[in-house]
A protein has these predicted regions:
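Internal glycine-rich, Lys/Arg-flanked active-site/core loops of soluble domains
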Residues: 150-290
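Hydrophobic transmembrane signal anchors and adjacent membrane-proximal interface regions, especially
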Residues: 78-80, 86, 93, 143, ...
Length: 405
């Protein structure tokens, strides 16, 4: 019996672990709950009709993009319904199952499929019961699975699922609180404390456009995109966080304005929670060459290429994409290209270089050799700036790009 089951598994037939009953989880949810919440809270109540229509269209696109990306990556095995519920055909995807899947992926990353084939197969089977995905039905598909969907992409997918589930649970909890509360809408707890305001000040728009045009690389595919709209980010940080940022800026100095690119399907989560420092794992995701930090660039199309999907072609190209413009406290910056950096790494035999004690950030220069987080030497085409403390970041604008009319 076990032999027959294993033979089926090798051909791509998998059981799926049912986490819970969809109907019971969805009992308090309502259609378009996620979209309605995002539109209600992200759009200022005093916005004019044209601005509301523009922002509603933007938010609708961000919600549907996340839905489409999760369905597409999983081959349709995982869907997000209109309420925001993340589900499979037989159950829902819970935070518990995602956390268990991450542990299983960690185990898989340390196994050699050729040396530990049975253990690898069992672990991969367990992973795909937790996070169902369409697989190749040909014999030996398990040998090629992580060539099709790399470990780094799987870690990113788990991160996306986790944020989607957390958002659904927060919105559902808010709905239940609102039903039992007598407070007015203004006093109700919010899922999104952020609001997006369309910038109409020509001086501000022209300044941002010039900063983009003056620092773009014509060799980048995204250099053909144009700045379409600029949205001011209001309320993402509370008063305490803003005061702390200003205090830190005075203490450390060297505050710079940099670009940060992110895929469209990540934007709602960032507008809800701010930027995060991705969890460490055995594999670098895009742009993790200099340690676990938040990556920025002064070269606009370096960041926009990431937003567009140039560095991540496996998940599609978005020609209508976005970048954040942020104030970043660089303070005392460590130059990864400095000759001393290589000597320091060799002398200490470090394999995990960044962050460097006594420094507030790292600058990796394009066109020269830099010491990476693993102690290797690499050459970059573009400048990258990395900070390791979220308190050093203040997102100011969400900038929309596309081909225009």
């Amino acid at each position: 019996m076990r032999q027959k089951a294993m033979e089926k598994f090798r051909k791509g037939y998998l059981p799926v672990e049912t986490v819970t009953n969809t109907d019971s989880v969805n009992a308090h949810a309502k259609n378009n709950m996620l979209l309605d919440c995002a539109i209600k809270e992200l759009i200022p109540s005093k916005a004019k009709k044209a601005e509301k229509e523009l922002l509603s269209k933007l938010i609708n696109m961000l919600v549907s993009t996340n839905q489409h990306q999760i369905a597409n990556f999983s081959g349709g095995a995982i869907q997000i319904d209109d309420s925001g519920l993340v589900k499979t055909a037989v159950g829902v995807v819970s935070l518990k199952s995602i956390h268990e899947a991450r542990k299983t992926l960690d185990k898989l990353s340390n196994l050699d499929v050729n040396k530990n084939e049975q253990d690898f197969i069992d672990s991969l089977n367990h992973y795909l019961m937790l996070i169902p995905q369409k697989v190749n039905h040909s014999r030996g598909w398990h040998l090629s699975f992580f060539r099709q969907h790399s470990f780094a992409q799987q870690y990113e997918f788990l991160e996306q699922l986790e944020k989607s589930v957390e958002m659904y649970e927060d919105i559902l909890a808010q709905e239940q609180k609102n039903k039992s509360s007598s407070n007015s809408d203004d006093n109700q707890p919010k899922v999104f404390n952020t609001q997006l305001k369309l910038v109409t000040n020509k001086k501000v728009i022209d300044k941002i456009k010039s900063y983009f045009d003056d620092n773009k690389n014509a060799a980048h595919g995204s250099s053909k995109l144009q700045l379409l709209n600029v949205y001011e980010i209001v309320g993402l940080y509370n008063d305490e966080q803003l005061i702390a940022f200003d205090k830190l800026a005075k203490e450390k100095g060297n505050v710079q304005e940099y670009w940060h690119g992110s895929r469209n399907y990540n934007l709602l989560s960032i507008l809800k929670n701010g930027l995060i420092i991705p969890k460490s794992n055995s594999f670098n995701v895009t742009g993790r060459m200099f340690g676990d930090g938040v990556y920025f660039s002064n070269q606009s199309t370096k960041s926009l290429n990431y937003s567009q999907g140039y560095w991540d072609r496996g998940r599609g190209i978005d020609n209508n994409c976005f970048m954040f413009l942020a104030d970043v406290i660089m303070g005392k910056a460590y130059e990864a290209s400095h000759k001393q950096a290589k000597l320091d790494c060799q002398n200490t035999r470090k394999t995990r270089v960044y962050p460097v004690k006594g420094y507030d950030s790292v600058i990796a220069r394009g066109g020269v050799k830099n010491v990476t987080h693993s102690g290797d030497i690499c050459s970059l085409s573009n400048d990258e700036m990395i900070v390791f403390d979220l308190r050093q970041i203040k997102l100011k604008y969400l900038c929309e790009f596309g081909f225009g009319d």
